[in-house]
Every structure is written in structure tokens, then in C-alpha cells.
């Protein structure tokens, strides 16, 4: 099965995204861990899910996906922000047997490592993001969601806090410009 997935990746139909447990640059993917599979064509994603007819004329495609398509769309937008054909999306996992934590994407911007979470609901928990930020050398993170722009100061401990920028999904295509102005 793994060989078939690698062939599909070489044909640029999908991407196998391997995790890292690092919170500093350079990021090294752990190819011994299970990868996330990202289809590179959203139309194929909808086709294989059997949602073509239902999507035409529908204003809210997330209702079919119950929010799960949001991570795919944001991942696609992050890929468009680079001109490197070989660019890979990387996600973070906590390297611990007793705890599972995952941050959806780690995005590199001007030598900084930016944690990016994608949440479709407004009351989503951010425990994994907080775990990442406890050890990361960064004082801000990004959450893409289906709500208006807002900013939160998250207090992790007496000595550690970070700014969480809550961006509407449609800000993904201008993430670099947002970071340029705000960090």
C-alpha cells in the first residue's frame, strides 16, 4: 500500500505529509511515523466522497463535510504561498507515549516557525496548540476558523504567553501579508 501511495505522490495526485516533533527550525520529517494524506485536487476529494451534485449551488460546502474539508482547503492555500514545486506541508505531533497532540500545519515565514491550527467551530479546544507553544520559541500562532478576525492572549504559565490570531478561512491566501504587518 505504501508503494502505491508513493507512486500517486510522484504523479502529483496526492501528498504524503509526515510529522515532526520538533519546535525549532530546521524541521525534519519523521518518515517512520504515519503520514497524513492530502489530495492535491479538491475536485477529486469531492468526487471520491460522492458529493458532486450536492455541492453545485450550495453556499456552505462545510455542511457536507462537517468541517473536515476546512483543513484540506487551508492546506491547499498554504501550498500556493510558495513557488517551490517540491514544497511539503508539515504537521507537528507530540513525541510522547502518554499523550497525543497534533498541530495541523507548521508554516515557515522569514526564518520563523508558525503554528497553524484549522478549526471549523468557534468553541474548539486548542490543547494541542498549547502543548506546542509551551516549548516553541515563538510568541504567536494562527487559527483559521469560520468566525470573524479576533486576537486572544493565551496565558500558558506565569512566564509564558502567546498571541493567537484567529483568522477567517478566506485570510489563508494572504497569510504572508498578514504576518508581514502583524509580527
Which functions belong to the PLM regions below?
Residues 44, 97, 112, 121, ...:
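Short, glycine-/Ser/Thr-/acidic-enriched flexible segments
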Residues 90, 114, 142-143:
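A structural signal for isolated positions on well-ordered beta-strands in alpha/beta enzyme cores
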Residues 120-163:
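Catalytic cores of nucleic-acid endonucleases
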Residues 1-102, 107:
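Accessory nucleic acid-recognition modules appended to NTPase machines
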Residues 149-183:
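Domain-level recognition of nuclease-like catalytic cores that cleave nucleotide substrates
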Residues 107-115:
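Active-site beta-strand-loop-beta-strand hairpin of nuclease catalytic cores
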Residues 63, 115-119:
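Short, glycine/charged-rich beta-strand-loop motifs at protein surfaces that mediate ligand recognition
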